[in-house]
């Protein structure tokens, strides 16, 4: 096997919550890392940036011409209003990416990050189909509903046959990690919510369902996700396999929520059985409050919409089902890494404080 110093990787979505972690770990291991993203903000130092529109097939071919990466990590997606649109757009992104990779260009492995909507269904038909019992296993049959994850997988499998590379699929749960201006960032969303509630003298109210409050759940640390993606891309045991990826522990929000409230010095309240209290509703007037907090503390970002993804946390915490995964397949294949979910949450809070994104307490 070649040494890491002459190995080249391409990360699509490099400035995202998982892309940043993948890039950082590869760079630490001596890889040459190229990253494709819409913006350069959040690009880890040492990454060779590529700016191209994933929906423009010609632009993708021009941007990747001659690159010849050994491994490609696909972590980007584009959120649309309906699943039909998600399928069209996100199917096109991976198709354009794979078409832009030269058939004889040295690509050995392509790793695709998806998630638990593989088992739950898409956002516009969320948890309405007949689902398997928890914990979710990788060999569960697909749901009988349209899902852009299925479309992306099928495109990946077909390209692998034609172009001769191996593949892996990584189904993460809610990701705890570091990124700004990210579509799905629960740690930063809940942290911003807690800071606003503290300033307003209001309680840190659980916005979701009693089922989510009381049920067993797991999450995925972004660095752990990166470790599994890299492992599957460099170990034969990861070839042509789909893997769940979660921290390895489980918890109930009724246990973790009070700890988060205490960490931020704010009183908390559990869910109301008769009605959700969604963050999108609670935080509809958050923009000027956060702007004042940012000005007072000299924070780097005053636009709350670049920090908090209210809709995503509402979606995750509003589930009326229990949701966690089985990690046996990954462990049996040799990936034994794990994380503590509470430590993951609070270590990321400290990272945001250190970066002057959150107030330093």
For every predicted segment, state its role.
Residues 2, 6-29:
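N-terminal Rossmann NAD(P)H-binding glycine-rich loop of SDR-like oxidoreductase domains
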Residues 226-314, 318, 326-328, 332, ...:
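Mid/C-terminal beta-alpha module of Rossmann-like enzyme folds, strongest
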Residues 41-43, 51-96:
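NAD(P)H-binding glycine-rich loop region in Rossmannoid oxidoreductase-like domains
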Residues 151, 185-189, 208-233, 240-241:
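Substrate-positioning beta->alpha
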Residues 163, 177-193, 231-243, 267:
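Glycine/proline-rich active-site loop of Rossmann-fold NAD(P)-dependent oxidoreductases
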Residues 140-173, 178:
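Active-site Tyr-X1-5-Lys
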Residues 31-42:
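Conserved glycine-rich Rossmann-like NAD(P)H-binding loop of the short-chain dehydrogenase/reductase
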Residues 85, 92-148, 168:
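Conserved Rossmann-fold NAD(P)-dependent oxidoreductase catalytic core, especially the SDR/UDP-sugar
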């Amino acid at each position: 096997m070649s040494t890491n110093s002459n190995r080249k990787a391409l990360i699509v979505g490099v400035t995202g919550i998982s892309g940043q972690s993948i890039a950082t770990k590869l760079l630490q291991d001596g890889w040459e890392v190229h990253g494709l993203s819409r913006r350069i903000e959040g690009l880890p130092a040492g990454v060779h940036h590529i700016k191209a529109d994933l929906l423009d097939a010609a632009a993708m071919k021009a941007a990747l011409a001659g690159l010849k990466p050994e491994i490609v990590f696909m972590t980007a997606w584009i959120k649309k209003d309906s699943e039909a649109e998600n399928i069209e757009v996100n199917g096109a992104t991976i198709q354009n990416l794979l078409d832009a990779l030269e058939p004889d260009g040295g690509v050995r492995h392509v790793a695709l990050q998806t998630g638990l909507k593989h088992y739950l269904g898409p956002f516009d038909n969320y948890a309405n189909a007949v689902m398997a019992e928890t914990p979710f296993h990788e060999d569960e049959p697909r749901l009988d509903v349209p899902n852009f994850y299925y479309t992306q997988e099928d495109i990946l499998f077909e390209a692998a046959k034609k172009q001769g590379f191996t593949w892996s699929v990584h189904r993460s749960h809610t990701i705890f990690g570091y990124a700004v201006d990210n579509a799905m960032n629960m740690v930063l969303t809940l942290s911003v919510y807690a800071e606003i509630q503290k300033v307003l003298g209001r309680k840190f109210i659980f916005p979701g369902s009693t089922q989510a409050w009381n049920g067993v759940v797991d999450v995925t640390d972004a660095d752990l996700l990166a470790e599994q993606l890299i492992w599957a891309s460099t170990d034969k045991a990861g070839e042509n396999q789909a893997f769940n990826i979660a921290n390895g522990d489980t918890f109930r929000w009724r246990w973790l929520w009070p700890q988060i409230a205490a960490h931020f010095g704010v009183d908390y309240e559990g869910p109301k059985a008769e009605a959700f209290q969604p963050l999108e509703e609670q935080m509809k007037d958050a923009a000027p409050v956060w702007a004042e907090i940012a000005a007072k503390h000299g924070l780097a970002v005053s636009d709350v919409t670049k920090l908090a993804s209210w809709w995503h946390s509402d979606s995750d915490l509003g589930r009326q089902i229990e949701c966690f995964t089985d990690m046996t397949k990954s462990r049996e294949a040799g990936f034994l890494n794990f994380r503590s979910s509470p430590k993951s949450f609070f270590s990321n809070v400290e990272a945001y404080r250190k970066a002057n994104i959150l107030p330093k307490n």
